[in-house]
Amino acid sequence: MPSQVIPEKQKAIVFYETDGKLEYKDVTVPEPKPNEILVHVKYSGVCHSDLHAWHGDWPFQLKFPLIGGHEGAGVVVKLGSNVKGWKVGDFAGIKWLNGTCMSCEYCEVGNESQCPYLDGTGFTHDGTFQEYATADAVQAAHIPPNVNLAEVAPILCAGITVYKALKRANVIPGQWVTISGACGGLGSLAIQYALAMGYRVIGIDGGNAKRKLFEQLGGEIFIDFTEEKDIVGAIIKATNGGSHGVINVSVSEAAIEASTRYCRPNGTVVLVGMPAHAYCNSDVFNQVVKSISIVGSCVGNRADTREALDFFARGLIKSPIHLAGLSDVPEIFAKMEKGEIVGRYVVETSK
C-alpha cells in the first residue's frame, strides 16, 4: 500500500503541568524512531489512568508537556528504519506499555510491565489523544483486519488488563468470579471475558443504569452497593461460601477490604484498580485461616494482548462504548471524576 500524505501538524490534547489546562491545539506530527511505527490514530479509549496522569497522583515520572491517552487504534502510516513485521496500511494498536528493553530478567520471561526501562504511553511517551502517535514496533499490537477500530480501542488497555487479571485469579470454569466495579470501562469488559472463559459472574456496582448494563452483558447476580447493606454476607450466601476469585477494578479502598472477606477459602483477590494513596487492608487471621491469596495484576504482556484481541475478533467480547470527539476529553474527565460513566468513552481524533 502506498504511503499516505502525512501532515506536519495535527490536533492533540496537551497539558503542561499536573492538573493543568487540557488544551486542544495544533502540535507537530512526531517522527518515528528507527524502532518505532507511526500510527494514524483513528480512535482512542479514555481510561481512568489518563485521569491519574493528569492529576499526577500516582508515583510515576511524567514528561511535560504531555499528550495523554493509551488506548489508540489506527493505521500504520510510516515505519522506522529498523522495523520488521509491519507494513504501511496495517491496523495497529498503541497500548500503555509502549516500549521495554526486552533484555532484562522481567522482559525475558514475559513480565514486561515490570521492566525498569518501561516507556509508558501517556505518561513518559506522548499518547493517543492526538491524530498521529508513535509506538515501539515490538510492543505495538497487531489488530486483525476488518475489526471495528472504535470498538477495539478499549481492548488495548482495559480489555487486556482484565483478561490478564482473570488469568491470575486461577479460577476454573463453573466457579464464581466477582467483579467489584462491574459496569465501568474495565468492569464491563471483565464481565464478558469471565463469561467467555466459563465463569459464573457476580457484579458489584451502583444504580439502575449499571444494573441494566450488567444484565445485558449476561452477568448472573448484580449487587447494588447503594441498596445492599451487607455485601459480604450477600455474596457468601449467593455463592454458598464465597467467590472463588475477585477482580477489583473499583477505585474504592473500602471495596477492596470487603473483597478479602467475601473471597472463598483458597480463593484469590486480584487488585487492578489503583485508587490514589489507598491501602489494601486485610484481616491477617482471616487471610491465613482461609488461605486467601491477594495479588496485584498490571497490564498484560504481548501474549495476553494477542489472546485478548482474539476473543474480541471472534465476536465474544463487545465494547459498550460512547463515541465523542477528541476535543471532548475535558468533559469526559469531569464525568469520570463524578462516577457518571457507564461503559467506556472512545474519542474520534478527527473531531
Swiss-Prot record:
Binding site for NAD(+): 48-49, 52, 184-186, 205, 210, 225, 272, 274, 297, 299, 344
Residues at which Zn(2+) 2 binds: 101, 104, 107, 115
GO molecular function: alcohol dehydrogenase (NAD+) activity; zinc ion binding
PTM annotation (Phosphothreonine): residues: 226
Location(s) in or outside the cell: Cytoplasm
Glycyl lysine isopeptide (Lys-Gly) (interchain with G-Cter in ubiquitin) cross-link, renumbered residues: 229, 237, 290
Domain of life: Eukaryota
GO annotation, biological process: amino acid catabolic process to alcohol via Ehrlich pathway; glycolytic fermentation to ethanol
Protein's UniProt keywords contain Lyase: no
Catalytic reaction annotation: a primary alcohol + NAD(+) = an aldehyde + NADH + H(+); a secondary alcohol + NAD(+) = a ketone + NADH + H(+)
CDD domains: CAD3 (cd08297)
Remaining remarks: Present with 1310 molecules/cell in log phase SD medium.
PANTHER family per the UniProt record, alphabetical: ALCOHOL DEHYDROGENASE 1-RELATED (PTHR42940:SF3)
Protein name from the UniProt record: Alcohol dehydrogenase 5
Source organism: Saccharomyces cerevisiae (strain ATCC 204508 / S288c) (Baker's yeast)
